[in-house]
Amino acid sequence: MERKMLKSKIHRATVTGADLHYEGSITIDLDLMEASDIIPYEAVCIWDVTNGSRFETYAIEGERGSGVICINGAAARLVAPQDLVIIASFVNMENAEAIAHEPKLVFVDDKNRMLESRKEVAGQATLKSVHWKN
């Protein structure tokens, strides 16, 4: 039996741009792509924490160290600069592999600089390293 598992997550990144006239995708700072094990053209889910929209697109490389998180193409109508988003990718794997699987989770600050990469912890709102905005 195969299971669909979370492979990668960039948690609460800040949208820096929305380019309606680009052909599609999400541009992600290359540092964040590497830290989260997301490769160019990989399918990703985008969950907008600010407005609740959810959609799927694919990742393309942004300038390393720039903090860029730019939603491109038609999906640009679903977000606004400064929205907080979660970027996730998934992988299918056999049950035995899934049991031991640990996803790459990347937590960022409000400039999309990596704060840490670690396991997800229940009750994250109490962690000092995570800055929650309402």
Curated annotation (Swiss-Prot):
UniProt keyword Lyase, yes or no: yes
InterPro entries: Asp_de-COase-like_dom_sf, Asp_decarbox
Keyword terms: Autocatalytic cleavage, Cytoplasm, Decarboxylase, Lyase, Pantothenate biosynthesis, Pyruvate, Schiff base, Zymogen
Role, per record: Catalyzes the pyruvoyl-dependent decarboxylation of aspartate to produce beta-alanine.
Coiled coil: none
Species of origin: Geobacter sp. (strain M21)
Processing after translation: Is synthesized initially as an inactive proenzyme, which is activated by self-cleavage at a specific serine bond to produce a beta-subunit with a hydroxyl group at its C-terminus and an alpha-subunit with a pyruvoyl group at its N-terminus.
GO biological process, one term: pantothenate biosynthetic process
UniProt GO cellular component terms: cytosol
Domain of life per record: Bacteria
MF terms in GO: aspartate 1-decarboxylase activity
SUPFAM superfamilies hit by this protein: ADC-like (SSF50692)
Catalytic residues as annotated in Swiss-Prot or TrEMBL: 25 (schiff-base intermediate with substrate), 58 (proton donor)
EC primary class: lyase
Protein name as it appears in the record: Aspartate 1-decarboxylase
